[in-house]
């Protein structure tokens, strides 16, 4: 029977969850602060130069102006959601790094266990993967206590 690896203590898990949740909470706070400000504050007030540009753009045909507006709205929506996206990427990277570290730790611990010499143990490996050679070939009269050298393939 193999023993299960020890579970990390609950305070460590709580600290890990707090560290992972902090970027998301900060992103939500920044997003709510930017959403509470009206859109009129972000746009410059119309001046003589702006009024002529808007009028000439509409008069010349609105297709180029509408494509520019579409690009601007896409970019502004990405910039508005940037803290949330950043927090999501940070959490995903942290989770991936934690998973890789756990798997590497498990592989190295398992490798150390397999390399240990086992004396007087029950062979649980299938017979085709085990080579057995008697160590005490000179004492053939005592057949009850044959010691084997076991090599695993």
Curated annotation (Swiss-Prot):
GO BP terms, alphabetized: Golgi organization
Pfam name, any one: DUF1180
Topology feature Extracellular, residues: 28-84
Membrane topology type: Single-pass type I membrane protein
Protein family: Belongs to the FAM174 family.
Protein source organism: Mus musculus (Mouse)
Protein name listed in UniProt: Membrane protein FAM174B
A GO CC term assigned to this protein in UniProt: Golgi apparatus
Chain segments carrying region Disordered: 31-67
Leader peptide range in chain numbering: 1-27
Sugar-bearing residue positions: 50
Keywords carried by this UniProt record: Cell membrane, Glycoprotein, Golgi apparatus, Membrane, Signal, Transmembrane, Transmembrane helix
Places the protein is found: Cell membrane; Golgi apparatus
Transmembrane segments: 85-105
Spans within the Cytoplasmic topological domain: 106-153
Main function: Essential for Golgi structural integrity.
């Amino acid at each position: 029977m193999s023993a299960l690896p020890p579970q990390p203590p609950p305070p460590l898990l709580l600290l890990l969850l707090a560290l992972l949740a902090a970027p998301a909470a900060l992103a939500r706070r920044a997003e709510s602060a930017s959403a509470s400000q009206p859109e009129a504050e972000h746009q410059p007030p119309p001046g003589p130069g702006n009024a002529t540009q808007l009028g000439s753009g509409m008069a010349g045909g609105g297709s180029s102006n509408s494509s520019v507006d579409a690009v601007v709205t896409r970019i502004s929506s990405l910039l508005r959601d940037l803290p949330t996206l950043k927090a999501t990427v940070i959490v995903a990277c942290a989770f991936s790094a934690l998973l890789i570290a756990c798997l590497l730790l498990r592989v190295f611990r398992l490798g150390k266990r397999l390399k240990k010499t086992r004396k007087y143990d029950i062979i649980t490996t299938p017979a085709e993967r085990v080579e057995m050679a008697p160590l005490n070939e000179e004492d053939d009269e005592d057949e009850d206590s044959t010691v084997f050298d076991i090599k695993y393939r």
